[in-house]
Amino acid sequence: MPILGLKTPGPSHPAHFDLEPLIRPNILALQPYRCARDDYSAGILLDANENAIGSSIPSLANGVASQTLSLLSDSEIASLNRYPSPTHDELKRSIAKLRGVPDEQWVFLGVGSDEVIDMLYRVLCVPGKDRVMTCPPTYGMYKVTANVNDVGVLEVPLITDDGKFQLDEQAAFEAYPDLKMMFICSPGNPTGTLIPLDVIRRVAENPKFNGVIVVDEAYIDFAPEGTSAVKLVNEFANVCVTQTLSKSFGRLGYLVAPPPLIQILTNTKAPYNVSLPTASLATAALSTEGLATMSRAVATLNINRKALIEELKNTKGVGRILGGNNANFVLAEILDSEGKPSNQKAVEVYKTMAESKGVVVRFRGSERGCEGCLRVTVGTEEECKEAVKQLAALL
């Protein structure tokens, strides 16, 4: 069903899904904040009570451009005292082209994907009433944001057989009724495991599930080609995908979703949530040269990931490498003297490495199915070798 007279309603499949009843009534009736800059962006701008004298950044006043500012055009630098574009359509079009959706109407921008996740809660979930589903071990901000918004969380743990992590479809099926959202992290954090697209498709098609599936793909650029759920967004009205430039590009989050949901989010967001420098640098990162640079970086990190896994496997005191290894990190078990995964030993190693060795990793042993685990981000070749060296010395 088109929302607010949308010209591009998006996919109509599955037949049982209707977005409009899911939106909070006050959000559905909301009249979005509008400003003169929505219609006019050039000329003598006396509409927004800005500082017309110019930016107060010292490097600009002294005529010295920093490395970051040097990537901005002269006109962009001259406009730092102005409010940024409320829409950033050029950037959205670049993302749409990169990810394979029709146009900018399918893209919503946020300051990191955490803002996007928070916005989804705010437009879909009634505080004190609605619930969402998460599948631990998973990204902790789903639950934090639910708590902030007074939304209930139903946890359906991933199946953790043999150190692998997959969605428990039967348990999820039994929990479907009355859920507003289901969060699927793929590749997972901290698991690094991809959830197969066929599994997500079955959830989307299930008539018992009337909510929105949110597939968090923060690490998708490190996974094999063709594994992104964005292709499902083109087909299903109840699937959306959060991604971020923070892992393989820079610092920006976005949602790829059918236009009705994008419009609702756009109506609700703060008018100038993404700054001009962020949008300009993100646009540069998505240029032909920027994409080539990103591809080289991802290829290098994937090579380093493979080498790191092999070195960890050959390190005494390190147990299994868990999960799917489709992200820019590795999840490794730390063993005690009896050869069993140990949270106590993992915490000891984690603290000593950070405080005495200058190597900071992440303790993940408190997560379901991750007993005794440290999560090691894939760094440069030298950083990975140093991390393994210091780890081996402590084991």
Predicted feature descriptions by range:
Residues 249-250, 326-328, 368-372:
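Short acidic/glycine-enriched loop/turn segments that link adjacent beta-strands
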Residues 105, 240-241, 317-321, 359-365:
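A short linear hydrophobic-aromatic micro-motif
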Residues 302, 315-356, 378:
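Conserved PLP-binding catalytic core of the aspartate aminotransferase-like
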Residues 78-208, 219-244:
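Conserved core of the PLP fold type I
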Residues 2-86, 178:
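N-terminal "arm"/small-domain region of PLP-dependent enzymes with the aminotransferase-like
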Residues 238-315, 320-322:
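PLP-dependent aminotransferase class I/II
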Residues 198, 342, 355-356, 366-395:
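PLP-dependent enzyme catalytic core of the Aspartate aminotransferase-like
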